[in-house]
């Protein structure tokens, strides 16, 4: 069976309907234990105090904010090259989720930065690139709503997605490329000097997995909703023409 068969809306609806309960169950079994473990059963860090608990929301949200845009880029490229409508609708469905995750990362980052750096905001390379990524999410969603023809909207948002990918990459690697700025290096790193203690990273990995499963569940739900809305609009147009 070719993977492109799942680009068929009927096939996608059938498969996603079967997968959705399992994905929701996996979300509950990873996200809740990860957050409870991290917030209530890890010690207060000597260096960071209780603020360290923010990482169990901040790091997963920031990770998703970047990776969701990458997923949107892949889906947009599939649309631009192969003209599969499900891929365009999946990119559209993912955008609000990515926007919320970026906003959560910015807000929780501010709560981390205020006690650590003495300021709610700093024009740090990674913080600035994340803010720009957030604006790209808003622009992507606004462009979809502003254009009535769905194929034209998918084309233009696909191009916007390509441009925004530069800032998605910068958001991920800014702390590596530029040493200046306040933002720390990667929380989960092979470098022992940067890598957090085991007592913190174990629930963090579980929380990241939970956020990832939550995204998959929301993506399936929203894509299914977009397909239904597209079908309903097509039926209404046929009725008006009849």
Swiss-Prot record:
Keywords linked to the UniProt accession: Cell inner membrane, Cell membrane, Cytochrome c-type biogenesis, Membrane, Transmembrane, Transmembrane helix, Transport
Topology within the bilayer: Multi-pass membrane protein
Keyword Membrane among UniProt keywords: yes
Keyword NAD: no
Transmembrane segments: 21-41, 61-81, 93-113, 127-147, 158-178, 201-221
InterPro entries in the cross-refs: Cyt_c_assembly, Cyt_c_biogenesis_CcmC, Cyt_c_biogenesis_CcsA/CcmC
A single MF term (Gene Ontology): heme binding
Localization per Swiss-Prot or TrEMBL: Cell inner membrane
GO cellular component annotations of the record: plasma membrane
One record GO biological process: cytochrome complex assembly
Recorded superkingdom: Bacteria
Role summary: Required for the export of heme to the periplasm for the biogenesis of c-type cytochromes.
Family: Belongs to the CcmC/CycZ/HelC family.
Protein name listed in UniProt: Heme exporter protein C
Source species: Rhodobacter capsulatus (strain ATCC BAA-309 / NBRC 16581 / SB1003)
Gene (UniProt): helC
């Amino acid at each position: 069976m070719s993977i492109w068969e799942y680009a068929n809306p009927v096939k996608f609806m059938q498969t996603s309907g079967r997968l959705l309960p399992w994905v929701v169950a996996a979300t509950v079994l990873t996200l809740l234990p990860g957050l409870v473990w991290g917030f209530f059963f890890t010690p207060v860090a000597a260096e960071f105090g209780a603020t360290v608990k923010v990482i169990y929301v901040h790091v997963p949200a920031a990770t998703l904010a970047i990776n969701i845009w990458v997923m949107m880029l892949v889906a947009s490229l599939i649309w631009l090259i192969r003209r599969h409508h499900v891929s365009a609708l999946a990119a559209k469905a993912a955008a609000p989720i990515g926007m919320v995750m970026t906003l959560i990362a910015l807000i929780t980052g501010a709560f981390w930065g205020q006690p650590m750096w003495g300021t709610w905001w700093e024009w740090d390379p990674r913080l600035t690139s994340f803010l720009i990524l957030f604006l790209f999410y808003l622009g992507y969603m606004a462009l979809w709503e502003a254009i009535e023809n769905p194929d034209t909207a998918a084309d233009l948002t696909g191009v916007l997605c390509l441009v925004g990918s530069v800032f998605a990459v910068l958001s991920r690697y800014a702390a590596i490329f530029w040493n200046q700025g306040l933002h720390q290096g990667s929380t989960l790193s092979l470098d022992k000097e940067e890598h957090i203690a085991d007592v913190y990273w174990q629930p963090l990995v579980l929380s990241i997995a939970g956020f990832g499963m939550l995204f998959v569940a929301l993506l399936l739900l929203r894509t299914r909703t977009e397909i239904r809305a597209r079908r309903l609009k097509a039926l209404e147009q046929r009725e008006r023409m009849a």
